[in-house]
């Protein structure tokens, strides 16, 4: 089979002898070969995506014909050259600027990282502007200037990508890859069934519990293509089909490329470490924030339900509402009256402080509860930070949203 | 590294589990066979009896074993403390269809002091202090009932703040001294309260000097206290003077007649701190009055000074009697201010704490018993724990929260 050239596949396909799958195999193979032959341009870009920057190193074989360059190509080449030149000079400027900055800050220019740059800029050009995007910044030019798609066709006007005319080559080649993998799994399944090895298939399916499919927005960015809602649905359906196959765990890495982890998975690392104090008493520390308040909560186990908030007991909060706020994590975790807490809370008002303590308390309690209780706490929303903040006042308005009273005259 | 952390966590989890599995039961009072006094709906047989009461209705016989238990105040003694009670307490008692008070440690401590007192010494002062709603006033009532049974004469100012505030009140220039001001209505009210609390004891007491009200009206030597009170109630203009006369006679006669006088002043700090601009009492010229200028307050302050014997003064300081910006602390020295502290010093401070766990449970059980808590979750151990947490075991707070359940 290996001897048959890709072009031969087409012939075979046109004849009725071979199955469609044969065509698929060869086409896929051709696709892989194509990928191997092409190198990644702009590889210095930090998140250089090979899907985006596919372009050949001069691969055009010398032909007898005179090379004709299409008009569109010529225009593109001019643009690309201008872009490349501009980026080259920008990068050079950036490198020199970075060294200058390092010298100004009295640090070693060779080991001056981006974090150092950010710190230096914040120090040298302090800005009180509200919007962080409006503040001075110094970054790699590839992060600042919008990316430009590399040429999708060669000098002769022939597209590089074999799915160029689908308009969404990356999207459709992904679908193609999924289908191919699914077919392979199906084959394998058939084979295993034929060999009576069904019991080996147990537990071979992919577990979807802890992650979810990438969003449409993320998919668009990943593909660098304008994918529509309908196409996204199609993609997810196909992916679901792959993921629900009994042998899908074999393609775990591929599937996980298109999935994002849920919060619960990330939480595992957020469980605070348990320290054992003198006398065998365990304690765990966590911090929480809400509005402008910050709280550091230290939970002791075992305890008797005592609270020490900034040196006071629960009377620190005069209203029952705030005590009820603190009550919830203790009730959900079932540790009411079994732990003591030492709290250091600052800034903000009682609502923010109570919320901050609640978050810190919930996080600290994670150290003492079982997995299922952790999940319960997450579902209750105890581990989710309330992202709401005070909205700024706008000029020309009375407040954040409220307008001045309108008077006709 | 990851394995070691996993191991560590699992070991912690197992240790935690062993702790979690220990179900610590809330320690309640052991049930005792106490009679059921109430006329309310009869208890169902299958309901478990919750121990929150004691059958010992005589407050003189209460001991440390009774702390946290409720005792029923008999009807006739209820009449003594009823008139001075806050309407809120009376409403609760009406809802419960019985009048019960909890035996608290400060009341027992106070009773212990009173039992061992040498009455020949100048009047000792006791000062109750504690957080808002921790039971200072009910401790006073408990003690008053105790002393009433022992035959003491009770001089009770239920809420001293009433005499220094109010923009709607009638304020008259004193008939006795022109730079002092009378509160005829309040004085009359207090006279009725005094008569109700000492019913049957006042007719035997007679005045020892002559009091001239006007050119035509006067009280001869030997006029009974009853008559003085009746005069004050019929001639409101002189009601404040009547209060002064009664208090003075009590101070004078306590020693000679062998009386035992119990002076009880709730929220005594109202006597010594200036109430705020808006609601302080004002005279006809709209001038703000100091507490000392009000004749009632002036006379009661004399009862608190150690210039007489055969009496006891029990006071309570409360945050409510102070201006809103002076309620940061509940200690006597903060609430009384310099002047008040110097006037009362030396005194015996008695701290009225919030409920202990046992007392709070007894209170919740009492509410359950009275069907005040009807929510099923409130009757479980977890529910009770939550109630205690949210109220921070403050009696008044607990009552407020339970009112919604």
Region locations from a protein language model:
Chain B
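Phosphate/oxyanion-binding active-site loops and adjacent basic polyanion-contact surfaces
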Residues: 95-107, 136, 183, 235-243, ...
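Short coil/turn segments at secondary-structure boundaries
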Residues: 141-142, 159-160, 167-170, 276-278, ...
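Sensor-1/coupling segment of RecA-like P-loop NTPase cores
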Residues: 256-336
């Amino acid at each position: 089979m290996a001897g048959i050239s890709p072009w031969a596949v087409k012939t075979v396909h046109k004849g009725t002898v071979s199955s469609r799958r044969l065509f698929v195999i060869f086409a896929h193979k051709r696709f892989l070969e194509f990928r191997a032959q092409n190198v990644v341009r702009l590889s210095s870009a930090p998140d250089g995506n090979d899907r985006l920057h596919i372009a050949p190193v001069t691969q055009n074989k010398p032909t007898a014909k005179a090379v004709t360059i299409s008009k569109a190509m010529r225009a593109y080449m001019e643009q690309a050259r201008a872009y490349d030149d501009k980026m080259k000079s920008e990068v050079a400027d950036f490198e020199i600027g970075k060294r200058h900055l390092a010298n100004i800050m009295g640090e070693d220019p060779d080991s001056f990282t981006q974090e150092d740059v950010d710190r230096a800029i914040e120090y040298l050009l302090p800005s009180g502007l509200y919007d962080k995007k409006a503040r001075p910044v110094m970054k790699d030019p590839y992060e600042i200037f919008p990316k430009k798609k590399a040429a999708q066709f060669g000098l002769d006007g022939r597209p590089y990508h074999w799915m160029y005319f689908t308009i969404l080559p990356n999207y459709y080649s992904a679908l193609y890859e999924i289908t191919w993998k699914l077919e392979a799994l199906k084959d394998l399944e058939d084979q295993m069934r034929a060999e009576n090895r069904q019991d080996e298939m147990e537990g071979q399916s992919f577990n979807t519990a802890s992650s979810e499919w990438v969003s449409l927005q993320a998919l668009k960015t990943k593909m660098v293509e304008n994918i529509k809602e309908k196409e996204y649905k199609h993609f997810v359906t196909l992916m679901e089909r792959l993921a629900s196959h009994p042998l899908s765990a074999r393609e775990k890495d591929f599937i996980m490329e298109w999935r994002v982890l849920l919060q619960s998975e990330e939480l595992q690392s957020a469980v605070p470490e348990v320290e054992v104090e003198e006398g065998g008493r365990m304690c765990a520390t966590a911090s929480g924030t809400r509005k402008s308040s910050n709280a550091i909560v230290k939970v002791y186990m075992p305890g008797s339900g005592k609270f020490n908030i900034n040196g006071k007991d629960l009377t620190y909060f005069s209203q029952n509402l705030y005590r009820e706020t603190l009550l919830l994590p203790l009730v959900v975790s079932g540790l009411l009256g079994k732990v003591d807490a030492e709290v250091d809370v600052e800034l903000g008002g009682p609502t923010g402080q109570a919320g901050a303590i609640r978050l810190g308390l919930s996080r600290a309690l994670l150290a003492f509860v079982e997995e299922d209780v952790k999940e319960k706490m997450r579902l209750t929303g105890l581990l989710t930070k309330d992202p709401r903040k005070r909205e700024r006042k706008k000029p020309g308005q009375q407040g954040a949203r409220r307008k001045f009273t309108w008077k006709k005259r | 590294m990851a394995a070691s952390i996993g191991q560590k966590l699992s070991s912690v989890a197992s240790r935690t589990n062993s702790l979690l599995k220990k179900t610590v039961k809330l320690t309640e009072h052991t049930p005792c066979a106490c009679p059921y006094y109430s006329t309310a709906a009869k208890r169902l047989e299958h309901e478990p009896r919750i121990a929150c009461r004691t059958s010992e209705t005589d407050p003189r016989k209460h001991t440390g074993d009774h702390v946290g238990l409720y005792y029923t105040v008999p009807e006739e003694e209820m009449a003594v403390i009823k008139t001075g009670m806050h309407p809120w307490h009376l409403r609760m008692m009406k809802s419960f269809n019985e009048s019960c008070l909890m035996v608290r440690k400060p009341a027992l401590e106070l009773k212990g002091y009173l039992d061992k007192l040498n009455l020949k010494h100048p009047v000792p002062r006791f000062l109750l202090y504690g957080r808002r709603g921790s039971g200072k006033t009910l401790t006073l009532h408990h003690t008053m009932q105790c002393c009433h049974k022992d035959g003491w004469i009770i001089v009770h100012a239920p809420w001293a703040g009433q005499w220094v505030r109010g923009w709607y009140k009638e304020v008259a220039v004193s008939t006795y001294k022109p730079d002092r001001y009378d509160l005829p209505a309040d004085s009359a009210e207090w006279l009725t309260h005094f008569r109700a609390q000492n019913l049957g004891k006042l007719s035997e007491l007679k005045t020892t000097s002559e009091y001239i009200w006007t050119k035509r009206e006067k009280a001869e030597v030997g006029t009974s206290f009853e008559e003085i009170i009746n005069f004050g109630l019929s001639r409101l203009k002189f009601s404040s003077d009547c209060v002064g006369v009664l208090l003075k006679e009590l101070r004078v006669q306590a020693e000679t007649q062998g009386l035992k006088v119990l002076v009880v002043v709730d929220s005594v700090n109202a006597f010594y701190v200036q109430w705020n601009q808006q609601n302080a009492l004002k005279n006809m010229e709209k001038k703000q009055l100091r507490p000392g200028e009000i004749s009632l307050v002036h006379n009661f302050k004399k009862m608190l000074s150690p210039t007489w014997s055969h009496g006891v003064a029990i006071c309570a300081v409360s945050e409510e009697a102070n201006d809103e910006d002076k309620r940061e602390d509940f200690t006597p020295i903060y609430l009384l201010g310099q002047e008040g502290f110097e006037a009362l010093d030396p005194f015996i401070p008695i701290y009225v704490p919030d409920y202990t766990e046992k007392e709070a449970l007894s209170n919740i059980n009492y509410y359950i018993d009275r069907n005040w808590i009807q929510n099923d979750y409130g009757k479980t151990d977890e529910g009770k724990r939550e109630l205690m947490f949210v109220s921070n075991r403050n009696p008044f707070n607990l009552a407020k929260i339970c009112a919604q359940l």
